[in-house]
A protein has these predicted regions:
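Extracellular/luminal regions of secreted and cell-surface proteins that mediate adhesion/ECM remodeling
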Residues: 390-410
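C-terminal PAP-associated
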Residues: 1-391
Length: 410
């Protein structure tokens, strides 16, 4: 992707397409990500530079009219490294970004100053201790879904650890805590990780290669193994905080492969408290299809919506969604899958939909918006929207009819 454009919610264009280089200049290497900071009421566009992060935030809630505060890759350098596969998250005290790099693999941008357009906004880098990888790293910091922020500090970094990898003895999750001091960076810290044991999983496809899922024609598609998929989401509730995220797993043994989505909800009693696994599940698509490239979030009622890609060796890529109500049986996506979009061609490349993303509409905190890629016939983006929660505030129904005992009601 090399350009961006704004659309109204009805799908009509609100602006012409613009090259990313009009924002960031010549040091622009792609992988753009668009986000909305609900608490600040600002829009964000990011991309990779050759050795830094490009970052633009709208000056107001209308970037078409009022423009952007722009920080190019020189402002936010990444220690001379190309910031491969960046994943951004919004937290109370910073914009956090994980990268597939050696040495420092987590960067934090100074949110308060960036919102004000302050040119002195700074960046801090961290190397997550004891993070084992398969050779490709894609951890994520929790991203705040709505405008209800926790206290500053105690940002949470999450990564899977597969016992199929060297130096990992049992399947588990690792959790790190990051605390930032913008006044004195020497006081900033990332913790040693603690582990959350999980049910067994296999995240390795084809020995770790990028060619995995067989199409009816063309190359095998990258399943995006060893990645916490975009984004790991955080939401506060009156009695607890929740985090939801997912990664792809292989649910067949031997040489046969079927991609499925391993997903989690973690909970903590209050800000800064330890996380525990509240529920985990593995979503397998019907008819033996692959399910991968998923993105999930929670609405204001605690319902989970999940968009994902699906395909097999005879059917091209489709975009679909499923979900669950907050009080449904633990570990199950109970809502029958629904179709968002159907490809009519196959993918000519192995790489596919690295940045599928689901967001919750800030207008009602209920509607899910899912964006991913499909082929019709070439590579295209498709946005789908769905809602699980009812539109009314209170679910009112008849409890009993006391009178008349018989006859017509009027």
């Amino acid at each position: 992707n090399s350009s961006f454009r704004f659309f109204n919610l009805d799908g009509t264009a609100a602006s012409p397409p613009s090259s990313l280089s009009t924002l960031f200049g010549s040091d622009e290497s792609g992988d753009p990500i668009a986000m909305y900071d609900s608490e600040a009421d600002r829009y964000i566009i990011t991309s990779m530079g050759s050795s830094g992060l490009n970052f633009a935030i709208s000056q107001t809630n209308d970037p078409i009219l009022d423009g952007w505060h722009v920080y190019n890759a020189i402002s936010f350098g990444t220690d001379g490294q190309f910031p491969d596969y960046p994943k951004f998250s919004i937290w109370s005290d910073g914009y956090y970004c994980t990268t597939n790099t050696s040495g420092n693999d987590l960067y934090v941008l100074e949110r308060d100053k960036i919102i004000d357009g302050d040119p002195t906004a700074s960046i801090q880098g961290f190397n997550a201790p004891q993070m084992i990888t398969s050779g490709f790293a894609s951890a994520q910091v929790l991203d705040i879904t709505n405008d209800d922020h926790p206290a500053a500090g105690n940002a949470t970094l999450i990564y899977l650890q597969d016992d199929a990898w060297n130096q990992v003895s049992t399947d588990h999750l690792k959790i790190w805590t990051i605390n930032i001091d913008w006044e004195n960076p020497n006081n900033s810290s990332i913790s040693t990780p603690y582990q959350l044991p999980t049910s067994s999983f296999t995240s390795v496809f084809d020995g770790g290669s990028f060619a995995n899922l067989t199409q009816s024609s063309g190359p095998d598609i990258d399943a995006m193994q060893a990645c916490i998929m975009n984004q790991a989401q955080f939401r506060k509730f009156p009695t607890h905080n929740s985090a939801v995220f997912n990664f792809v797993v292989d649910v067949l043994s031997g040489s046969d492969e079927q991609a499925a989505v391993r997903w989690y909800e973690l909970r903590q009693d209050s800000d800064g408290e330890p996380w525990v696994i509240y529920q985990e599940g593995t979503y397998t698509a019907p008819a033996g299809r692959h399910a991968f490239g998923a993105s999930m979030a929670m609405d204001v009622q605690g319902n989970i919506g999940m968009g994902y890609s699906s395909m097999n060796s005879t059917n091209p890529i489709t975009l679909r969604y499923t979900g669950r109500y907050a009080n449904d049986p633990s570990g199950q996506m109970t809502i029958e899958e629904n179709l968002i979009g159907q490809s009519n061609a196959t993918n000519p490349n192995t790489r596919y939909a690295d940045y599928s993303q689901i967001s919750v509409d800030p207008a009602n905190d209920k509607t899910f918006w899912f964006v991913s890629e499909y082929f019709k016939p070439g590579r295209r983006d498709l946005v789908g929207t769905f809602q699980i929660a009812a539109n009314y505030a209170n679910d009112i129904g008849v409890v009993s009819v006391d009178t008349p005992v018989s006859g017509l009601l009027s």
